[in-house]
């Protein structure tokens, strides 16, 4: 149903929204239509990228590692810590405990999503974006660490709410940093 609604919205929008030709757009906005942008390759753009791009890229690189590992190993971690499954056993993934833990991981990911939505509402309240981003990543790191030490399935909600805080910042803040670091016209779109 959701996909059908999305497709209908896209069809409606593309059929109803008419774009101005470039010359008419330039006249309407009092732009010099004769000015041509120089076309540069992506390697040149990377060489001229602001330092913020590289800093954020490095942080994102390591942040995404954490989430890739989480998506891969959460079932086993929750099964071992909360259901007592011996993950070194050859049949660990076929045990009832592992299956129940796998089901519970779905609940934990839902809790993470809720934490992410709530934190996304809080993020704009910070005066410093860098502080908000750093704090979010530290809160998320605390959540990741806590998962190794919690042995109650309901207490696992706490680290996953914290991980959700990091997730909200990882998705929103880098785009803000990089777009604000771009200078001039023609870098976007």
Sequence positions of predicted segments:
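Loop-to-transmembrane helix entry/capping segments in MFS-fold secondary transporters
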Residues: 102, 184-189
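Short hydrophobic/alpha-helical segments at membrane-entry points of transmembrane helices
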Residues: 55-56, 154-160
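Helix-to-loop junctions at the C-terminal end of transmembrane segments
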Residues: 116-130
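Intracellular juxtamembrane helix-capping segments at the cytosolic ends
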Residues: 169-186
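C-terminal ends and interior cores of transmembrane alpha-helices
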Residues: 138-151
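Helix-loop boundary and gating motifs at the non-cytosolic
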Residues: 55-59, 63-91
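Loop-to-transmembrane helix entry
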Residues: 82-113, 155-158
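Intracellular loop-helix junctions on the cytosolic face of multi-pass helical membrane proteins
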Residues: 1-69
